[in-house]
Amino acid sequence: MKSNFGQSMAHAGFGIFMLAVVSNAVYSQEKIYDAKVGSKLQLDEYIFDFKNIEQEEKVNFNSIKAYLSLSKSGKDLGEFTPEIRFYSDPPTITSETSIIHQFFSDVYVVMNVPQNQESISLRLHIKPFMNILWLGVVMIILGGIITCLLYTSPSPRD
């Protein structure tokens, strides 16, 4: 086995990575909703059921947390808990994304800063081929490691 194996693996990994990046850019979906508790939101074949919203006070921040369940074709796939955090020192607002990982895609929800008391703005995303993207990255790393381990310096000539 020569060091070419590692190089081939790394290059194949880069090809897989690029294919996943392009496929993700073409096939990803996003939709923004102004939602109220009890709303059922749809993106592609996924149904997002907006269950509840809570305000929490922690030691160093206050937050607004939403609870949504995800289903597809009647099958429950999990629960999202996106969150907006308000830090006082220094004054900062952050958005905590909630993700459900699946084999061929990631589905995630981002909550925007509320503009009124009536509804909350939610961004729903479907990002396909994310695991394939990470497979490409792992192949690049392993290819580099294999190449380094199998590398032999040329012997000096007499």
PLM feature segments, named:
Residues M1-S153, R157:
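Solvent-exposed, non-transmembrane regions of integral membrane proteins
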